[in-house]
Amino acid sequence: MKKLIAYYSRSGQNYFGGQIKEVEVGNTEKLANIINEVMDGDIYKIEQVNPYSNDYKTCVKQAMEDNKNNSRPELKNMLDSIDDYDVIYLGYPNYCGTMPMAVFTFLDSFDFSDKTVYPFCTHEGSGFGHSLNDLRKYCSNVERGIEIVGSKVDQKKDEIISWLKEIQWLNKQREEIV
């Protein structure tokens, strides 16, 4: 099974443990890197051609406006295809109760009907929000994901690895049945 770890993440000012802090690596990117260490797939960062501001408050306003307008921001370095992948780990921070609009652009760009998707989400208290319902509109096979408080990603590595081992075990069981 060929795996893709696709994620959206942002560095700069982030809401981190109750306060705004400057981060060099976004929380979702940290989580994506942990997943890649264990699952050893191809990794793709979903990036906007015109990224949001590094200033947290400006970024929030931009994200809210994009969400309100149901925008589909143009992505840079877009993948040509996902046809070779069977499993996709899709990561994102919770923006406005769902995925960032750039993730919707990514989802609009490909056919996910024969893909198994494992979502992973970072947040500061809002969990997946309604992102799983939104994701199921694009992907027919969304499996159990993981949501992690972004400011605690570094402390949750064991929990993340346990989730990934469970996925590996379930996939092995499915292969034995078939």
Predicted regions and their residues:
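Short amphipathic alpha-helical segments and helix-helix/interface helices
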Residues: A32, V103-D108, L132-L135
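Short, conserved loop/helix-junction motifs that constitute active-site signature segments
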Residues: I82, D108-D114
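Short, glycine-/small-residue-rich phosphate/pyrophosphate-handling segment
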Residues: S113, Y118-Q155
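N-terminal beta1-alpha1-beta2 submodule of the flavodoxin-like/Rossmannoid cofactor-binding fold
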Residues: M1-V87, G97, F104, D158-V178
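Short, highly charged low-complexity linear segments
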Residues: N67-N70, G91-P93, V149-Q155
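Solvent-exposed loop/turn segments at secondary-structure junctions
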Residues: S11-Q13, V49-P51, N94-T98, E124-G127, ...
